[in-house]
């Protein structure tokens, strides 16, 4: 099975020192070496200050600057894992460095589209829906939405590098590690008005084109973030 891991942590206000950056990179390299057999995709995200939020749907998109989360933690990266079951995916997630100073949301995925090439400097479109209207895969509402995504896929096929729907938010698990102890919590990390519902990674020449493409996605809200292009995946 495939699982989507969304990495959440406090946004930095100042860059790390060269020594601290070297230490952190070594931690991420160790994780990649450890989890390499399970990692299928992933990357860090560019600063949240550069995020774009799109609301209103394809018929009347409204574009605003900044990330969707108004809390202390922002999305800092993502992974796609292949694991035998949820327990195996959570065991991988607890080794992600972000779990020690932030949190990792782990979501079962639906119908993952494998990347058509290595991802670097492309654009993550994170799809969000109001909690009360988020539908479960297989429901009539979900099937209707899937048809709309199929239409988007036909219109933007050459720009879609990968993507997937996520299972209902009730199936998500939040992973945090503090003082060597792992805490698992049912549900997403932030109890907000919106929850993740799916994602795409889009190829675009610049942010304007990425926003134009993301505005076509049939979702209540889309957060557009550039990939940092440092994972080599």
Where are the regions that the model predicts?
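Conserved, structured core segments of small domains
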Residues: 1-233
């Amino acid at each position: 099975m495939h699982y989507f891991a969304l990495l959440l942590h406090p946004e930095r206000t100042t860059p790390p020192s060269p020594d601290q950056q070297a230490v952190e990179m070594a931690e991420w390299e160790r994780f990649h070496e450890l989890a390499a057999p399970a990692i299928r995709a992933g990357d860090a995200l560019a600063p949240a200050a550069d995020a774009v939020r799109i609301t209103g749907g394809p018929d009347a998109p409204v574009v605003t600057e900044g990330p969707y989360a108004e809390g202390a933690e922002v999305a800092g990266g993502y992974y796609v894992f292949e694991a035998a079951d949820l327990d195996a995916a959570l065991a991988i997630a607890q080794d992600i460095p972000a779990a020690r100073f932030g949190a990792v949301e782990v979501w079962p995925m639906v119908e993952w589209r494998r990347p058509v090439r290595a991802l670097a400097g492309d654009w993550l479109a994170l799809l969000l829906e109001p909690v009360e209207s988020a539908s479960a895969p297989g429901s009539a509402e979900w099937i209707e939405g899937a048809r709309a995504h199929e239409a988007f896929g036909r219109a933007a096929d050459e720009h879609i590098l990968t993507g997937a729907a996520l299972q209902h938010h009730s199936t998500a698990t939040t992973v945090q590690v503090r003082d060597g102890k792992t805490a698992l919590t049912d549900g997403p990390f932030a109890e907000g008005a919106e929850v993740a519902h799916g994602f795409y990674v889009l190829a675009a020449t610049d942010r304007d084109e990425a926003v134009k493409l993301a505005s076509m996605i049939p979702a209540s809200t889309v957060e557009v973030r550039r990939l940092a292009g440092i994972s080599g995946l």
